[in-house]
Amino acid sequence: HIQGTAYGSMDDGATIIELMNEAGYDVATLGNHEFDYGMARAKAVIKEADFPYVSCNWVDLRTGLRVLPAVKLFPAGGKWIAFVGITTPESFTKSTPAYFMNAKQTKYIYDILGGDDGRKLYDAVQKAIDKAKTLGADIIIGLGHLGVDPSSSPWTSEEVIANTTGFDAFIDGHSHTVMENKQVYDAAGKAVTLTQTGSYLANVGKMTIAEDGAITTELISTADVSDAAVAATAEAWINDVDAMLGEQIATTDIKFYINDPATSKRRIRMGETNLGDFVADGIYTYFNEVEQLDCDIAMMNGGGIRTDVDAGKWTFKTCKQVSPFGNVACLMSVTGKQIQDALEFAARFAGEGGKENGGFLHVAG
């Protein structure tokens, strides 16, 4: 939640946390992008928040202890509601592995428990659920950043539910999926409500727990309400960023897209788009024409290309919105076999009826 656009990344998420504080958040968990600015910044974000963070599977390997509490309980309607925080083990690869290492980068000192078969993740989650029960929880809700993309297997929210018992509902993120209500069966055959709001606050999720424990969910896409303090903070920061990055640097006659123009569904993670081509062309041109180096092929993963761009002027902010993560382009010598392996691995979910994969490669050369 502190990444994704220029408004998040220009101050390493500080204003986003300020807005969350003013909005009155009660609890949050960490996703992979909370680590994008380094481990020290991730910990600072937690301290800046007026609300607690929970994660049952972020571990300090030097002590063997969790970095954060696994569970947070709240009283409501005469019952205790527990939230179990779960962070995607993909944080290692979808953030920066070095951030989880010691200063000399000789060994890992932090882990996001996952396991190649998912068992470490499932065990950590089950222990947290059991802990919530011992603390007196009447309702237990998973608060995860796991997603449902096949490329995230075996760490998807659906797999976590299927390999544990005790959840009553699960609020998910990571895959940017719009999912109002899906029933997923846990290891004991109990139906668990799984929900996800999509991305960029296109929806706000509403979960209602009835007196008898029945759970219903709703996705709210529009609301005629505003908080003056939150709106003022947001407007001031938007104006600051627009001023910093507002200089025009180019003009285009066409729309560049990450979403399929025919269906409006995101395509950048499963197939070619003109913006994916353009970004890869830009990397290729940079190395060959700006740095005067011998670059044969350029590759860029679709997960790092984040927004459509309408025809018209391009500013520095446009570039920051397209590629907000501050990734560094690298030039290396590889074999033809390595290139083939990379392309095949990137396209393993593509094709007819393909599934999203942030590692899908866009190429130039």
Regions found by a protein language model. Give the residues of each.
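Acidic, metal/ion-coordinating pockets
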Residues: H1-S226, M270, N274-T285, C295-A298, ...
